[in-house]
Amino acid sequence: MISKGKTKGSVRFALTPARGGKKVELAGEFNDWMPSTMRKQKDGSFVSIVELSPGTYEYKFIVDGQWIVDPDNGARALSAVGTINSVAQVG
């Protein structure tokens, strides 16, 4: 799930893994597809706040090493290498 963060330009990415994942990471065009660890919350969800300029960004979550699209965001794109990615529209 993506939503506006508390500060201007911040985007909140959140995921509650279906199988209670132990490690969740976020990777996308905004961090050169280098996975960054998301913070686990008391409710079992994982959250990451990213500062982004207006634009369109492709991204995925990595749950215990498995790359997945955002199950709460139906916006998708086919990448240049033939994989399906989630899409975040900012601004």
Regions found by a protein language model. Give the residues of each.
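Aromatic-rich carbohydrate-binding modules that target alpha-glucans
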Residues: 4-54, 66-91
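A short tyrosine-centered beta-strand micro-motif
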Residues: 57-59
